């Protein structure tokens, strides 16, 4: 049987070899995961990754020693800094090393998710709702429902839940009454699995929030950004590949409006036909709308000229009255 020192040395060599050989490290949570489940996950990952457990104090010392070596790479030093800053090597966690895509590893972990009953004292990872309907329980067992304030009635000799009831919320501690009722209803509400907490990939640390982002979310953010940039460029009059089309259309509309207002006709691009259509109100869009105030502008001086004699007569009449 190897000594403790030899075992630690072999563990250190394996951990350093994995940190050097693989570009991606997944920090995974192991809460409520049983040994058989861990064994099954390790066997499924055998061709894709290496799964390592161990004392976090020992792992931290090995990572720190690797970063303080004379020939330590900048990435090794940065990895140690990130582990210390975010306290990655702590709690009931494991390490998965791989060069494959993270999605391949998470798909294996999801495939080994196990359904479990709610045990007394366990922390609920999800909301648990008891659905309405017949329970198949005899009327003598209504006390279990009364303890949780669940409205029931007797129908066809069986206890029936009137309305659905939430018995657990995320973070709640399972008490004896809730655990007993869920067991009698044959409800196993919890799912446990090796859960990815964070990922170190080629010198970049991705947190749990980063990992929750999907390709659709990233695509939506990029499209919104491109739309905002295009709107700013269009408003500022800066031609780009996405704004040159609308800018040319707006410029042509302005030319057509000027043509309508000044009686100038241009033959290019069906200018004469479009001008006649705008004058006759047959052209939809802002061209005819822009042409209306321009065409109405010359009529304003003539209207003012007609009003001038009336104003002058009133002025003369008023002056004559004074003298």
Curated annotation (Swiss-Prot):
UniProt KW Transport keyword: no
GO terms for biological process, alphabetical: cytoplasmic translation; ribosomal large subunit assembly
A GO CC term attached to the entry: cytosolic large ribosomal subunit
Cited SUPFAM superfamilies: Ribosomal protein L10-like (SSF160369)
Disordered as annotated region, ranges: 296-323
Acidic residues bias locations: 308-317
Post-translational modification: Phosphorylated.
Keywords of the record: Phosphoprotein, Ribonucleoprotein, Ribosomal protein
Cross-referenced Pfam families: Ribosomal_60s, Ribosomal_L10, RL10P_insert
Subunit structure: P0 forms a pentameric complex by interaction with dimers of P1 and P2.
Name of the protein this chain belongs to: Large ribosomal subunit protein uL10
This protein's encoding gene: LIPO-A
């Amino acid at each position: 049987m190897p000594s403790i020192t030899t075992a630690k040395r072999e563990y250190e060599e394996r951990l350093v070899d994995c940190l050097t050989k693989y570009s991606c490290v997944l920090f995974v949570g192991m809460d409520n995961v049983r040994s058989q489940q861990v064994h099954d996950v390790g066997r499924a990952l055998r061709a894709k990754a290496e799964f390592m457990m161990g004392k976090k104090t020992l792992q931290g010392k090995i990572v720190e020693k690797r970063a303080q070596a004379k020939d330590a790479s900048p990435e090794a030093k940065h990895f140690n800094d990130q582990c210390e800053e975010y306290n990655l090597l702590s709690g009931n966690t494991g390490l998965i090393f791989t060069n494959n895509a993270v999605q391949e590893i998470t798909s294996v972990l999801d495939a080994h998710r196990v359904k479990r009953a709610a045990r007394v004292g366990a922390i609920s990872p999800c909301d648990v709702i008891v659905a309405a309907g017949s329970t198949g329980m005899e009327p003598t067992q209504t006390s279990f429902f009364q303890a949780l304030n669940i409205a029931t009635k007797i129908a066809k000799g069986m206890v029936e839940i009137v309305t659905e009831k939430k018995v657990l919320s995320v973070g709640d501690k399972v008490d004896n009454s809730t655990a007993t009722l869920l067991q009698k209803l044959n409800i196993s509400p919890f799912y446990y699995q090796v859960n990815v907490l964070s990922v170190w990939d080629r010198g970049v640390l991705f947190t749990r929030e980063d990992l929750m982002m999907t390709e659709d979310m990233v695509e939506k953010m990029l499209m919104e950004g491109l739309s905002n940039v295009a709107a700013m460029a269009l408003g500022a009059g800066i031609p780009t590949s996405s704004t040159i089309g609308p800018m040319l259309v707006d410029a042509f509309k302005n030319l057509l409006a000027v043509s309508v207002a000044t009686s100038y006709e241009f033959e290019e691009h069906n200018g004469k036909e479009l001008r006649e259509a705008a004058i006759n109100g047959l052209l939809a869009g802002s061209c005819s709308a822009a042409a209306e105030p321009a065409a109405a502008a010359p009529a304003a001086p003539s209207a003012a000229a007609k009003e001038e004699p009336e104003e002058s007569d009133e002025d003369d009449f008023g002056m004559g009255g004074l003298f």
